[in-house]
Amino acid sequence: VNHKSRRIQVTDTYAQSIAHMLKYDSLYDIFDADVQSKKDALLVDGREVKIFAEGDPALLPWKELGVDIVVESTGRINNPEEAAKHIQAGAKKVVLSGPAKGSECLTVVMGVNEDWYDPAVHHVVSNASCTTNCLAPVAKVMHEKFGIVKGLMTTVHAYTNDQQLLDMPHRDMRRARAANLSIIPTTTGAAKAVALVLPELKGKINGFSMRVPIPTVSVVD
């Protein structure tokens, strides 16, 4: 929690559960702050963080609360039109924490193309995927210094919630296998997404992902 932020609100459910997970993380250990919960809020070192359990972004009280920027990271919304409902609710800007789907939406990777952002025009912006944020800055430097004719990337990626703890049917038969026991080859949109922030590399980079049995840390080569 950034104590320099003016206001912070969270859209989720079960404040008590969120407070416990924030305080005690399976991977990152104990959060060095006093974390408490009440019916509709977290208390972090005495500072209140309101929690809302509203599924429709248009119904959230962003105008009443004076919210400027919404970080849409629920994983349920990746369509700019749907994300724009936060603006209907009173927010000024929306940042998608993953790749945008549907209509055209500005994708920004910091250090690569943030100068494309025009606050008068861009109200819903995608921050791309974690893999794209890893790949694009490296590709930018390599292309500027040496020139990329063709590229092949591999991301060795920690397993995610889209996978199964035990073998279980899945639309992708490889992902049907137990995430904590398997190295699973799968697709990644990161290579294609690089062209959204580095259009000069469109069609030049391809790649795939290897989901490996670790809960955190990923790498791109």
Name each model-derived stretch.
Residues V1-A176:
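N-terminal Rossmann-like NAD(P) cofactor-binding subdomain of oxidoreductases
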